[in-house]
Amino acid sequence: MIAVASGGLFLVAWILSPKHGRLAHLIRRFRLRLQIATDDLLAVIYRREESGRLLMNHGENIVISSSLLSWLTKKRAVSKGWLDSSVLDSESRLQLTPKGREMAQSIVRGHRLWESFLHRDFQLAQDHLHEPAEIAEHFLGPDLQRELSERLDTPGTDPHGQSIP
């Protein structure tokens, strides 16, 4: 009986521990996933605006499909003041606010700086630059971006010829 009670207490602690429990781990992973999805949404809208297109194409709509994560992503972006809430129901017409454009610009800047860094310092081919930059862009804050920019002598364009904001 004591072994069963001890096992039960261990199981409860293993699941509910605020720092190392499974539930806390799942919550942290979901928050990170939501942050990355929000960053991706802002970057897609920024790139669309940068190219002068008003509507998203089918490939871009995949990023903001009708899943729960997508809905939470848009809600989070609106609550942070990054997306214009008046067009929230129209996925093809999502618009950044000035604050959202600044955030998206930072994400795209990090992406393009990382591509430039990989191309220059590791001599990676252009077709091998996008995926690592797609991951790194979510973790490159202003300090790292500034350091990368200085290290790269403030490049104006990335290896693909896109301007670095």
Language-model segments: what does each one mean?
Residues 51-165:
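Structured cytosolic domains appended to multi-pass membrane proteins
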Residues 1-47, 138, 142-165:
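Membrane-interfacial segments at transmembrane helix termini in multi-pass membrane proteins
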